[in-house]
């Protein structure tokens, strides 16, 4: 059975007018249930991740400031969310949801987190709505537990996974691949194992051809587990993305990646990442397509 990490705490209350579309974390499971794509049995509520697991990916001083709610105001502004006990609890549960999802993927082939994809969080900083890097934390958990030896992170959010790249810069057992808008945030990029910077305005056929040509190359690393970050800020409707992908192409992107995982018998954990279209229905539809494609391929 496909398992999906979700908890009501994911939809964290934000000040009125905040630009982050937090409502999507309520609407995604709601829509999947309404359409009969999933049942309540597919959903699980993760607990908070343990401190010792966080510290395999994040610096002790940074974690202590988060834990004690003493992160300087300037650093909180860089993250984009006002720090609070409830926000911290949310982040801890999202990270554990990705760990649990990775363990479920070992059993069922695929698992999802309705949130996560917090790839801008580096070892000692947070930014861009990211505090703790869920897929980095989960990858280091799998390595330290001896469950996997070669982990591939496929990051197709429109923004480079700079935090993920920094965390694993000197880790030979994790291969980081980021395909992103070259001129988009973050403006000072880190070095992934493979970065493909896309020009503004790239359309469906060109984007999908680059991905099709690149996926087989990733097998040279000989991964035995994959984390996939399926951001939908690549859509032509996205107000931050600057690319020109249709909803159909975004869905085809997901199908290509997840079929690749299935064809090569590679378990995959999927986190949702970003999406900033003005109409929240576009965001939710595109995210739900990721679930539909994955469930169709693996279930």
Where are these regions (language model features)?
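A general "terminal functional-core" signal
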Residues: 73-299
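Metal-dependent C-N hydrolase catalytic cores
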Residues: 2-136
């Amino acid at each position: 059975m496909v398992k999906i990490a979700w908890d009501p705490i994911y939809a964290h209350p934000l000040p009125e007018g905040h630009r982050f579309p937090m409502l999507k974390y309520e609407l995604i499971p709601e829509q999947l249930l309404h359409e009969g794509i999933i049942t309540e049995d597919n959903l699980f509520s993760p607990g908070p991740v343990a401190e010792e697991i966080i510290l395999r990916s994040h610096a002790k001083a940074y974690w202590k400031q988060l834990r004690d709610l003493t992160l300087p105001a300037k650093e909180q502004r860089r993250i984009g969310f006002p720090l609070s006990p409830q926000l911290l609890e949310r982040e801890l549960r999202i990270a554990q949801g990705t760990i649990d999802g990775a363990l479920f993927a070992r059993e069922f082939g695929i698992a999802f987190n309705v949130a996560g994809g917090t790839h801008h969080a580096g070892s000692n900083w947070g930014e861009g709505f990211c505090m703790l890097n869920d897929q980095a934390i989960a990858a280091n958990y799998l390595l330290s537990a001896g469950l996997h030896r070669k982990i591939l992170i496929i990051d197709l959010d429109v923004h480079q996974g700079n935090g993920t790249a920094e965390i694993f810069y000197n880790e030979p057992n994790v291969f980081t691949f980021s395909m992103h808008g070259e001129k988009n945030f973050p403006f000072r990029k880190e070095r992934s194992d493979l970065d493909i910077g896309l020009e503004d305005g790239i359309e469906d056929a060109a984007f999908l051809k680059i991905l099709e040509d690149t996926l087989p190359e990733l097998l040279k690393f000989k991964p035995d587990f994959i984390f996939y970050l399926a951001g939908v800020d690549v859509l032509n409707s996205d107000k931050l993305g600057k690319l020109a992908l249709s909803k159909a192409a975004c869905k085809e992107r997901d199908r290509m990646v997840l079929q690749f995982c299935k064809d090569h018998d590679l378990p995959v954990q999927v986190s949702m990442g970003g999406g900033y279209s003005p109409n929240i229905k576009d965001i939710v539809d595109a995210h739900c397509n990721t679930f539909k494609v994955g469930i169709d391929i693996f279930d």
